[in-house]
C-alpha cells in the first residue's frame, strides 16, 4: 500500500478501524478496499477490544437484538484459495457467545461494501462471476461455524444502493455487479438451508419512501416508477425469486443489457429470501415539474425540493415518522414475508454534559 491508502477493517459492530501498518491488523485479517475519503483516521469505539463491556452496556439498555457485520477479510484474507483464518472465526464466535450470554439475538450481515483487497487484486470487481463463488464459500463457512449461535442472517447490506447514485463506471457496470450479487445472495440462501433448515436468510434493501410532490397524475406515476427503480427492483427479485416485468423498462432506460442464464434464473427462484430487511431514515418527494426544483432526469427525487409538512435534521434529512408507518404498510402488502427494520436513526449535534449525559 502507499501513503494515499489507509488499511481499513470493519469492527464487529460495523464501525471501521483504520491504520497504516499491516502488522497492526487484528486477528491476521488483510486490509479491506476503501479509498482514503474519510475525514479522520480515528478509531470509532474500538469494539474489537471492548466488545464484552459494550455488549454488557447494550444488554443494560434492554436491547434483545444486535445487528453487526462479519468482516469477509477476517475470515478469508486471501480468498478461498488462501484458506480460513481460524483466529477470525474464533473472534466472532466469542462475540456471538457474549450476545447469547445476555439473551441477545444476533442478526448478522455478511457483506457491507467490503471485500478483501486480495479478491480485488486477483479477480477485479463484482462483474467477475468468480466473486459469486468466493462469496458463497465465505457464507458457507459462516453458516457452518455459527449455526449454533446465529439463526438470522443478511446477505448484502443495502444491495440496491448502486441504483441510488451514478457510478463512474456507468450503469452497465452497476447493473452487472448488482445481478451477480443477487445471484450470490440466492446461492447463499440455498447453502444455508442445506446446512440447517432452521437458518433464516434475508435480503437488506435501502429504504426508499417517497411521495408525489403534487397531485399531478404525472407526478404520481413518476413517484411509483422511482419506487420500482430504487427499491422494488431488488426486493421483488430477491423475495419473489425472479426479475419483475418492469425490469425491462429499467434496463431500456439505462441502456443496459444483462446476460441472465437459465442457471441464474433457477438460483434466484430456489434461493428466495426468507425475510425482507430494510433501512429507513427519511422520506423524499418526486416531481416531473422542473420549475419546482431540480428533478433528476425529468422525474425523480429532487435535491432542492423539501416536503413542506416535515421538519429536517441538521443535515437536511426530513424527519417523517408517519412515513415509517406508511412504508411498513407498503412492504407488508407487497411481500407478505417477515419484515425487519435493521437501520433507523437521526443525526444530531450532541453535547456531552459534565455528568456524562448526552443531549
Regions found by a protein language model. Give the residues of each.
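Active-site region of glycoside hydrolase catalytic domains
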Residues: 1-35, 78-80, 89-358
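Aromatic-lined carbohydrate-binding/catalytic grooves of carbohydrate-active enzymes
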Residues: 61-88, 108
Amino acid at each position: 500500500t502507499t501513503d494515499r491508502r489507509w488499511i481499513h477493517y470493519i469492527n464487529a459492530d460495523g464501525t471501521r478501524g483504520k491504520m497504516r501498518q499491516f502488522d497492526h491488523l487484528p486477528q491476521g485479517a488483510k486490509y479491506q478496499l476503501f479509498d482514503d475519503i474519510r475525514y479522520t483516521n480515528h478509531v470509532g469505539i474500538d469494539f474489537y477490544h471492548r466488545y464484552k463491556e459494550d455488549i454488557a452496556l447494550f444488554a443494560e439498555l434492554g436491547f434483545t437484538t444486535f445487528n453487526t457485520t462479519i468482516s469477509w477479510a477476517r475470515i478469508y484474507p486471501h480468498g478461498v484459495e488462501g484458506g480460513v483464518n481460524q483466529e477470525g472465526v474464533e473472534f466472532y464466535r466469542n462475540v456471538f457467545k457474549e450476545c447469547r450470554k445476555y439473551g441477545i439475538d444476533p442478526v448478522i450481515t455478511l457483506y457491507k461494501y467490503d471485500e478483501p483487497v486480495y479478491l480485488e487484486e486477483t479477480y477485479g470487481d463484482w462483474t467477475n462471476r468468480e466473486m459469486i463463488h468466493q462469496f458463497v464459500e465465505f457464507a458457507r463457512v459462516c453458516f457452518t461455524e455459527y449455526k449454533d449461535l446465529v439463526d438470522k442472517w443478511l446477505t448484502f447490506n443495502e444491495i440496491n444502493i448502486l441504483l441510488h447514485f451514478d457510478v463512474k463506471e456507468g450503469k452497465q457496470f452497476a447493473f452487472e455487479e448488482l445481478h451477480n450479487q443477487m445471484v450470490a445472495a440466492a446461492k447463499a440462501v440455498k447453502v444455508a438451508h442445506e446446512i440447517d433448515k432452521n437458518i433464516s436468510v434475508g435480503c437488506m434493501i435501502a429504504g426508499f419512501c417517497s411521495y408525489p410532490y403534487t397531485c399531478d397524475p404525472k407526478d404520481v406515476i413518476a413517484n411509483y416508477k422511482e419506487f420500482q427503480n430504487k427499491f422494488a427492483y431488488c426486493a421483488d427479485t430477491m423475495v419473489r425469486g425472479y426479475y419483475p416485468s418492469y425490469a425491462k423498462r429499467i434496463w431500456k432506460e439505462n441502456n443496459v443489457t444483462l446476460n441472465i442464464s437459465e442457471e441464474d434464473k433457477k438460483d434466484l427462484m430456489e434461493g428466495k429470501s426468507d425475510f425482507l430487511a430494510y433501512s429507513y431514515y427519511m422520506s423524499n418527494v418526486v416531481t416531473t415539474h422542473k420549475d419546482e426544483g431540480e428533478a433528476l432526469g425529468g422525474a425523480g427525487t429532487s435535491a432542492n425540493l423539501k416536503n413542506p409538512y416535515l421538519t429536517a435534521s441538521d443535515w437536511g434529512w426530513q424527519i417523517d415518522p408517519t412515513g415509517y408507518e406508511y412504508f411498513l404498510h407498503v412492504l407488508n402488502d407487497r411481500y407478505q414475508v417477515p419484515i425487519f427494520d435493521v437501520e433507523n436513526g437521526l443525526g444530531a449535534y450532541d453535547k456531552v454534559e459534565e455528568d456524562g449525559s448526552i443531549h
